Design a protein with these regions (language model features):
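Active-site-proximal loop/hinge segments that shape catalytic or ion-binding/gating pockets
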Residues: 1-6, 11, 20, 25-64, ...
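Catalytic metal-binding/acid-base residues of hydrolase active sites
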Residues: 78
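Short hydrophobic beta-strand that contains or immediately precedes a catalytic carboxylate
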Residues: 72-75
Length: 248
């Protein structure tokens, strides 16, 4: 089992793609520093995320720059080849084992203001809670908060991408990160496979408008085009993540 940080490499950031920004900085940065998130969008002073962190960490980060705040990931308790929290991205960073020592964990997600929160010695308890929760598998991750910088050259074991990115600018940028690059089995599905009750029939209709067979590459193209509501594209991703996993 490992600690993973999920992300969408080809979604927009700073006029390019997320993976390009990562390659420029050599770091996986906090949502307070990047201004983007694949979850809630309240990472600003006085926002919900700011208040959650203030409570969880007893004010430790209240006055620090965004770049010094923790980054969020998940304990990949099932050794899932897709990562520990696929709700938040088609690709992921797999961290070196020693990073666990400077991480904290909780269940459920911190958006729910959990009381079960602590260091790595609490992981067996948190994993048992997650296993028994009955939550959808996009929602049952054991959340991790990594304290201190995450540098690709020293703290990361590998970046794991969807195979649709092989031979693309996404892979080229990933190979500039200074860590290994791997590929998981892949996400792909026809919108006809999506249950309209999962995220709504309007989301299935949007998915159909994007193509007959969807991949993370296609969704990233749609996200960068800026034609559709980003929150709706995010929900199409939830459907692809839920119904589009495949085995080798």
């Amino acid at each position: 089992m490992t600690l993973t940080l999920q992300f969408h490499p080809n979604w927009p950031h700073e006029g390019g793609m997320v993976i390009e920004s990562m390659a420029k900085t050599g770091m996986y940065r906090s949502q307070f520093a990047t201004g983007i998130s694949n979850g809630g969008l309240t990472a600003f002073v006085g926002g919900d995320r700011w208040h959650w962190e203030s409570r969880l960490f007893a004010g430790r980060y209240d006055g620090v720059p965004g770049a010094e705040r923790p980054v969020y990931g998940a304990w990949n308790r099932r050794a899932d080849p897709y990562g520990g929290a696929i709700r938040f991205g088609s690709s992921y960073v797999r961290l070196r084992a020693e990073v666990v020592e400077r991480s904290t964990f909780c269940f459920p997600d911190s958006v729910h203001e959990p009381t079960d929160f602590g260091a790595a010695d609490l992981l067996p308890h948190l994993c048992a809670l997650a296993d028994g929760s009955g939550f959808d598998d996009l929602d049952d991750c054991v959340e991790a908060q990594v304290h201190g910088p995450v540098r690709f050259g020293t703290d990361v074991e590998a970046v794991v991408l969807d195979p649709c990115f092989q031979g693309t600018e996404v892979e080229a940028s990933a190979r500039r990160l200074g860590c290994a690059v791997e590929f998981h089995p892949g996400f792909t599905a026809s919108p006809s496979a999506f249950d309209p009750d999962y995220r709504g029939s309007h989301i299935v209709e949007l998915a159909r408008s994007l193509g007959d067979e969807l991949t993370p590459g296609i969704l990233g193209d749609a996200a960068r085009a800026g034609v559709h509501d980003p929150q709706s594209i995010k929900k199409v991703w939830h459907c692809l993540a839920r119904f589009g996993r495949r085995t080798r």
